[in-house]
Amino acid sequence: MAINLTGRSLLTLLEYTPEEISFLLDLSAQVKRESRARIVHKRFAGKTLAMIFEKRSTRTRMAFETAFAEEGGHPIFLSIQDIQLGAKESIEDTARVLGRMVDAIMFRGYKQETVETLAKYSGVPVYNGLTDVYHPTQVLADLMTTQEVFGKLKGIKLVFMGDGRNNMANSLMIGCAKMGMHYVVCSPAELRPDENLMQTCLTIAKETDSKIEVIDDPEKAVDGADVIYTDVWASMGEESKQQERERLLRPYQVNEVLMRKTGKKDTIFLHCLPAVKGQEVTFDVIEGKQSRVWDEAENRKHTIKALMIATLL
């Protein structure tokens, strides 16, 4: 069956089928091959992308901006200081105005409700570049990187070490459930995943032959892991909780000893970045031969370009 994503938003991967995600990953691989071969297109010529940032960004901004501009489009950066979003003008009205002026909107900020409202009222594709609860474009890059290394996603065991409630843990759970992977959240009891999301993903897992577990013992969790993934201990906006998180998460640091506990020589390490080396991951691991974080970072651009090609053309 032909896949047509024209006009679609990406708010979470819950709204995408496994077949649609596979389509995006295949298109991402094609985009990457074209990029490496210096094949130039102008697929976004005459189109404009509004990029709204409440939170700072390196990879997300660079990926969206360069991907759109390379294809002949006009990306516009809008910080929260530049526009009236939710201040003197409602989010609904901002969405209506932008929808009359641009072809797509990217939002990176705090509340998931904001990106959902933009999608509801703008009438154009809206992309979630990160909220407090989800980071779907990052997971597309994670899945692409994993597939590049292992040649498949089905049955691959991915272990997330750290804060089981954060946006990466949530989004990876969805992505792994959709793609038939074995997903383990390894976190202390205080930072376990949201129960409602767990139940949603467990329901998906029954249909895709996925497996989802929550384990608090790091050594038990990583046994047989193909991918070990971690994120900063205190996410953006949670800096005041840094000391508490260090106390809770120090036993969940990804180091060389833990990497060896997988029992596999080809286990890879992933991190959405930025990383605090020496906290959630040691220097030796992130800079070591098992690390694929720089491929993963590059793949942000290819997956985001593929997403925009699929939804805008």
Curated annotation (Swiss-Prot):
A Gene Ontology cellular component where this protein is annotated is: cytoplasm
- Pathway assignment: Amino-acid biosynthesis; L-arginine biosynthesis; L-arginine from L-ornithine and carbamoyl phosphate: step 1/3
Presence of the UniProt keyword Protein transport in the record: no
Subcellular compartments: Cytoplasm
Write out the GO biological process terms.
Answer: arginine biosynthetic process via ornithine; citrulline biosynthetic process; L-arginine biosynthetic process
Highest taxon listed in the record's lineage: Bacteria
Query: Is Cytoplasm among the key words of this record?
Result: yes
Which reaction(s) does its UniProt entry say it catalyses? carbamoyl phosphate + L-ornithine = L-citrulline + phosphate + H(+)
Known Pfam families for this protein? OTCace (PF00185), OTCace_N (PF02729)
Q: Which residues bind L-ornithine?
A: N167, D231, S235, M236
The enzyme's main class, written as a single word, is transferase
Which positions are annotated as binding carbamoyl phosphate?
A: S57, T58, R59, T60, Q84, R108, H135, P136, T137, Q138, C272, L273, R300
Q: What is its EC number?
A: 2.1.3.3
Query: Which keywords fit this entry according to its UniProt record?
Result: Amino-acid biosynthesis, Arginine biosynthesis, Cytoplasm, Transferase
The UniProt similarity line reads:
Belongs to the aspartate/ornithine carbamoyltransferase superfamily. OTCase family.
Under HAMAP family, the record lists:
OTCase (MF_01109)
**Described function:** Reversibly catalyzes the transfer of the carbamoyl group from carbamoyl phosphate (CP) to the N(epsilon) atom of ornithine (ORN) to produce L-citrulline.
Protein's name in the database: Ornithine carbamoyltransferase
Q: State the organism's lineage.
A: Bacteria, Thermotogati, Thermotogota, Thermotogae, Thermotogales
